[in-house]
Amino acid sequence: KIVAKVTDSINNKKVTKFGLIYGLLKYNGKKTGITSDHLKIGMEGQFVRSYNTTQKGIWKKTDNTTTYVETMTYGANSKEAYTAEYKARAYAVLEDGEIVYSNAIDYSVYEIAEQLYNNCMMPTIDGHKYLYNTILTKVTPEYTEKIYK
């Protein structure tokens, strides 16, 4: 899941659509060759996909900011999916057609799970155990179990 925010206007222009663009950087040890320059509307291809946010993806709305969530799946529950490396960025389409992009981030599900687990950042013990049992030990069977604090 990626959580992003967008304001109702950017550069004094109304935002008409917004969403996320995902790129697959590396899977099964193979680099795909994509860069942040490939993460643009109209550049979708084998390793790049863009998704407009729908009403179901809107998490909360304040006076002038919308927080939205998108969940991406790729080879669910496999070592390959957990260790694949991704790139993502948010975009907003303005009323005049201009598209504004955020900076891109790189991540892997495994790296995020490891960070959350090792720092006991999950809100529940069940979530903590899920990371260990479902992701961390699937990639690294000898992963050391950590007590939830």
Task: Report each predicted region and the residues it spans.
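Short, surface-exposed linear motifs at loops/turns and structural transition points
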Residues: K1-K149
